Amino acid sequence: MIKFYNRKTKSYEIEKISGEKLLNWLYNSKNINFLDIVTKKKFFSYIYGQYCDSKLSTLKIKSFVNNFNIDMNESLKSIGEFNSFNDFFTRKLKSNSRTIYGNKNILISPADSKVLAFENIDINKIIQVKGSNYSFKELLNSDKLCEQYKNGSCIIFRLCPTDYHRFHFIDSGICTKTNKINGYYYSVNPIALEKIPSLFCKNKREWSILKSNNFGDILYMEVGATCVGTIVQTYTANKEVSKGQEKGYFKFGGSTVILFFEKNKVSIDKDILMQSNLGYETKVLIGDKIGKKFCSK
């Protein structure tokens, strides 16, 4: 059971998990050998990815929408217009379905997701979940940027399979080319995060730097997960991007976007920080205010 905070209703809710029974079974220590087959072998994600790209996979769209109460009024396409399950999964939304804060000093969410956020981070001991940490060096597979983000802020956006799976730029600026790091395909669900130490450092991931106009150099990292054989970047490197513009998308599966900010660049909203310190994620949508530009008093 995963409990998260809904800041609109100011109450806790229980997340409805796609494949919950399978996840609990896979991440039980007794099944670790089978888990390795699923997560450490590319063929599993490849085969399932091929199925999700096929016309046959459209048969599961309607039941998925009904089971998880997905609002198709937000989608540019109707259920019958999708060519595959991945076509549905990577669907685009109508422009009026999300509000992007235009104020340049407002920090927004890049994705529909559940959020954990931490300020003044120890780059050698970044929190994955309570009781489980990893280092910035492990995550990037390099130590060249460690000093730049020392004592900065880290925000983790976990996208579950039922979420809209495109991610966006949180500010205008210029984004560098994408750096790819090979890895496994563990689930990023909290069930898995509690069982697999330094999970984010083991999965397939990509990172880039958004040289933003208002929040300094923002390190963007996208982490793949079970059945996500592909992270697709749709932006053009080293060209001007705008706030709210699409950066890319994940194909089928849960996945994560992690943002790192330099010290004294952002102030994260207090309710998100409080819930994170209590161990609860906070639900957000693309464009939601999650903080503001740092201002010294």
From Swiss-Prot:
GO terms for cellular component: plasma membrane. Is synthesized initially as an inactive proenzyme. Formation of the active enzyme involves a self-maturation process in which the active site pyruvoyl group is generated from an internal serine residue via an autocatalytic post-translational modification. Two non-identical subunits are generated from the proenzyme in this reaction, and the pyruvate is formed at the N-terminus of the alpha chain, which is derived from the carboxyl end of the proenzyme. It catalyses: a 1,2-diacyl-sn-glycero-3-phospho-L-serine + H(+) = a 1,2-diacyl-sn-glycero-3-phosphoethanolamine + CO2. GO terms for molecular function: phosphatidylserine decarboxylase activity. Its EC number is 4.1.1.65. Pathway: Phospholipid metabolism; phosphatidylethanolamine biosynthesis; phosphatidylethanolamine from CDP-diacylglycerol: step 2/2. Belongs to the phosphatidylserine decarboxylase family. PSD-B subfamily. Prokaryotic type II sub-subfamily. This is Phosphatidylserine decarboxylase proenzyme. It comes from Clostridium tetani (strain Massachusetts / E88). The gene is psd.
